[in-house]
């Protein structure tokens, strides 16, 4: 029996933000998200710290002199939720900047609310 992919759920502007990135980044993130839909984890997907488990993952790609990130969650049984797609602009370290972490937390809450509503 063939595995059925989970649907992707785009929170807020994530799809528009992803499609505005360089084509090589869009392809790489698309591949990682496709793997997540089938219950697999892309080799370049890493758990995002501060979330306590491997349920919130981040994929990082470099292109055109910039660093791009996509954050998604596989915590919910009904779908893969894409929480944030952005270009990292901080010049200090590799940590995800606080404003982006705040966006991720807020969108994770929205995904949780949506998933709860889908189960009712």
PLM regions and their residue ranges:
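Basic, Lys/Arg-enriched alpha-helical interface segments
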Residues: 1-67, 76-77, 87-120
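Hydrophobic/aromatic beta-strand elements that line small-molecule binding cavities or substrate pockets
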Residues: 70-72
């Amino acid at each position: 029996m063939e595995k059925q992919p989970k649907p992707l759920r785009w929170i807020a502007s994530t799809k528009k933000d992803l499609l505005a990135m360089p084509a090589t980044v869009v392809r790489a993130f698309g591949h990682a998200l496709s793997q997540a839909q089938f219950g697999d984890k892309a080799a370049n997907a890493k758990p995002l710290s501060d979330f306590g488990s491997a349920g919130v993952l981040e994929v990082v790609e470099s292109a055109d002199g910039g660093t791009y990130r996509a954050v998604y969650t596989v915590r919910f049984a009904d779908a893969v939720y894409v929480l944030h797609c952005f270009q990292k602009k901080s010049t200090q370290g590799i940590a995800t900047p606080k404003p982006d972490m705040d966006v991720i937390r807020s969108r994770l809450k929205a995904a949780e609310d949506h998933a709860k509503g889908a189960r009712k």
